[in-house]
Amino acid sequence: MSNLFLKRVGFSMVLGMASLQAMAASSDDFVDAATEAGIAEVVTGKLALDKSKDPQIKTFAQQMVTDHTQANQKLGDIARKLDISVPDEAALTEKVKKMILKWRDESFDRSYVNNQVEAHEKAVELFRKEAASSDKAELKAFAGETLPKLEEHLKHAKELQAKHGQ
């Protein structure tokens, strides 16, 4: 098995952590999945800021860190208001860091942009479903408000993928 394949699989695991929960019906599952995906975006965005040499990828990564940090904070506030438990950020951050510990620089940009597309496709699906069918008005509103930003991220990630990915 090639090193590149193993890196892509590892990266997919990090950014696709919420993929199985994306189809979950409960508000608790949405909070868990969205929190896990959001934290993974922040951690990998910070890693891209450190490892990428490309200014466009660094700009995108900074946007991911900023936008997902804000969304994570807002989601956490809503979840606490609704008395929904929020996954432990420190534990999730550590989980993500352990999965990416062995990455090397040689194909980082390609792996990062390819998996940003995959992660944002899953996030758009998750948030679209919650915006359409949540039983909690606050989560429905949050998902609906956040969805356009995620769609913008997906569009930008696809543009970067056309240049650096595949």
Residue ranges and their predicted role:
Residues 2-166:
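His/Met- and acidic-residue-enriched segments that coordinate or traffic transition-metal cofactors
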